Regions:
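Signature aromatic-anchored transmembrane alpha helix within multi-pass, membrane-resident enzymes
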Residues: 317-358
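Short acidic/glycine- and proline-prone juxtamembrane loop motifs at membrane-interface regions
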Residues: 119-133
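Transmembrane-helix motifs of polytopic, lipid-linked glycan transferases
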Residues: 80-101, 139
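Transmembrane-helix signature of polytopic, membrane-embedded enzymes
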Residues: 3-6, 10-12, 93-116, 134-135
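Short helix- or helix-capping micro-motifs
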Residues: 19, 107-115, 162, 166, ...
Length: 391
């Protein structure tokens, strides 16, 4: 619903109702599907909390602990941080939309649009470091827009979100690219002559202390591990197109509408919009550069996809509803498929083994695993397979 009618329909009360209903849906999905291997890994780590871990910061693990105490060792408890992160994204959309010149309608439409994408609908009920980092990224985007508009206190909000986002997942560093336009926006550049940005920077650095404490205790294995993931191959555009295409896939047909909305926004020259475009594109820019050297995981671009929901809410075009409805239908079908497969995966695999010509038997896992960045894990498992076993 757009235009004057949509603005009248989306009252604050309906906005809160939307958030409540979406959170309920996320909770039902979370409680109804078995946890994955990654989620079990996070659960196991949360039973022995530490400053950080070898391959991840620990914020998502810490947040899991009170829910496990309250709800027991259940899928809902394990996934509660993801449910809360999705709610936080919705809550942050409203002040961000207002900063960009919109109101409740834009925030509500953007949040609804995200539910027409597989990565958000499923990711809101699946605990991961990505969804938590994305919530902090949206908060940091709001702060950057406010800074660009002359709000100096927003540096503290940016520092809080950047620091805690880094404690959620290391790719949060992409948000620093969003600070670049502040160098040529007069109101923002003037703030650099005051102590506030620099003190806020020290505050953000202090919030990341758990990562450095763990690293100092373990010969910096967590940092060295991240540097070891940088590909050493020659330059190629192959993986850039693969990364961008995979992000379109994660957003289903709704992603086509996102791309058109980005194009339509190019004429916005207000300081807030200039800053918003930069911070929204930052993850895609950074990891597309990484993709020049090798494969990167598609979901690292998730903050760009989430903020693209707002981009489309502000810049609808003829035919955008058809694209998003088609994307929503595809996402709903995928959700049903997830329910069917996860109810009894052992039986599904057993049937595939007895029917060599079945679709499942013809599916190649290597393309999927490369898209999400688990090639080494799959190769290790494949080397240990016995005859007739599947990865």
């Amino acid at each position: 619903m757009s235009g004057a009618g949509g603005r009248q329909f989306w009252t604050l009360q309906r906005w809160w109702l939307l958030l409540a209903l979406a959170t309920l849906v996320h909770a039902v999905v979370a409680a109804s599907t078995p946890i994955s291997g990654d989620e079990a890994y996070y659960w196991d780590l949360s039973r022995r909390p530490d400053w950080a871990t070898f391959d991840q910061p620990s914020l998502v693990l810490w947040l899991m602990i009170p829910f496990r105490a309250l709800l027991g060792e259940t899928a809902l408890a394990v996934r509660s941080p993801a449910i809360l992160a999705s709610l936080a994204i919705g809550l942050a959309f409203l002040p961000l939309a207002r900063r960009l010149g919109g109101d409740v309608r834009e925030a509500a439409v953007a949040y609804l649009l995200l539910h027409a994408t597989p990565f958000f609908l499923l990711g809101s009920s699946y605990v991961s470091t990505d969804v938590l980092m994305t919530a902090w990224f949206v908060g940091a985007a709001w702060a950057i827009v406010a800074i660009a508009q002359g709000e100096r206190r927003a540096w503290w909000g940016f520092a809080l979100c950047a620091g805690l986002g880094f404690n959620s997942k290391f790719p949060m560093v992409a948000v620093l690219i969003g600070l670049l336009p502040l160098l040529w926006i007069p109101k923002a550049r003037a703030q650099l002559a005051t102590p506030t940005p620099w003190l806020a920077g020290l505050f953000a650095l202090a919030l990341t202390a758990p990562v450095w404490i763990w690293g100092a205790q373990h010969d910096w294995d967590n940092i060295l591990f991240q540097f070891g993931r940088v590909p050493e191959a020659g330059f190629t555009l192959k993986y850039v197109f693969e990364f961008l295409g995979a992000n379109l896939g994660l957003s289903s047909l709704t992603g086509v509408a996102f791309v058109v909305a980005w194009w339509k926004s190019r004429h916005r020259r207000e300081p807030g919009w200039v800053a918003f475009r930069w911070v929204a594109a930052a993850p895609l820019i950074l990891f597309a550069l990484f993709a020049l050297r090798g494969r990167v995981a598609a979901h690292w671009g998730a903050p760009t996809l989430v903020l693209s929901g707002l981009m489309l809410a502000f810049h609808p075009f003829r035919g955008w509803k058809a694209w998003t409805l088609a994307g929503g239908a595809t996402t709903a079908a995928l959700l049903v498929l997830v329910f069917v497969v996860t109810r009894d995966p052992a039986e599904l695999v057993a049937r595939a083994r007895t029917q060599p010509e079945s679709l499942l038997a013809r599916v190649r896992a290597d393309k999927l695993t490369s898209a999400i960045g688990y090639e080494e894990t799959v190769e290790t498992l494949r080397a240990q397979l016995r005859a007739g076993e599947l990865v």
